[in-house]
């Protein structure tokens, strides 16, 4: 089925592009969520009239993505996580956690634009995570997972008091 995209869609096309997708994907996802419209003569005429505005909007998005990339390249996220005695994390870090931390820093990034090369981060260490901002423009941020310090010294002092 041919549809016209109403907004940029990763791995599919840009706003105003006519793309051929499977019928189920169009009927069950793209059309109900408003990401696309049917490709018929009427809609093609409407989008051809809007083409200049679409191109201007795409150029604005590209400029904003370049500015955002410059800011994001300086970002280092740090997660302090709990683990068991063998060093395994109780909770892994996924794209939602990273998007939430970026939001706290003032960056509104959609979760689907965060590319986790390694899948969810399940061990302590430093990782590079790619954020796809716009076609051909992406930023790499550093995510560091550190161990939360346990309060063993507090437990030891309590046990000494009980013995006395």
UniProtKB/Swiss-Prot annotation:
Task: Tell me the domain of life.
Answer: Bacteria
Molecular function terms from GO: rRNA binding; structural constituent of ribosome
Q: Name one GO biological process term.
A: translation
Task: Tell me which UniProt keywords the record has, alphabetically.
Answer: Ribonucleoprotein, Ribosomal protein, RNA-binding, rRNA-binding
Q: What are the GO cellular component annotations?
A: ribonucleoprotein complex; ribosome
Keyword presence, rRNA-binding: yes
- Name of one Pfam family that matches: Ribosomal_L9_C
Q: Which SUPFAM superfamilies match?
A: L9 N-domain-like, Ribosomal protein L9 C-domain
HAMAP family registered for this protein in UniProt: Ribosomal_bL9
Instruction: Quote the function comment for this protein.
Output: Binds to the 23S rRNA.
Q: Which NCBIfam families match?
A: L9
Q: Which family does it belong to?
A: Belongs to the bacterial ribosomal protein bL9 family.
Q: What is this protein called?
A: Large ribosomal subunit protein bL9
Q: Please tell me the species this chain comes from.
A: Borrelia duttonii (strain Ly)
